[in-house]
Amino acid sequence: MSRMQLYRRNGWGSAIVEAQLAHYGLDAEGVEVADLFLDPAARRELMRISPAGQIPVLILPDGRVMSESAAITLYLADMTGRDDLVPEAGAAERPRFLRWLIFLVAQVHPCF
């Protein structure tokens, strides 16, 4: 595989990763996932890729699998070396950013 694949669904937890990929100009194939609550086969298929069976899942070009939007967000920032979305380690803004990132994934995403 030469490009990343993002397993996604509109209105689910993949939005932050999609926005970040677009902002950084990174190429990723979007793989639309059916409603995991209504389609047991879709959940089983996703669980073959990522045992948690949650969206988002990012498949890296070398085949490694990433899940958890916060982890993907930090990885993409590290990969690009840019700090315009994610403050670099040691930056004064980093603690506040991390607090809001974790708040988003722990408190807001579960509501969707």
Regions inferred by a protein language model and the residue ranges of each:
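GST-like domain detector, emphasizing the conserved glutathione-binding G-site
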Residues: 1-112
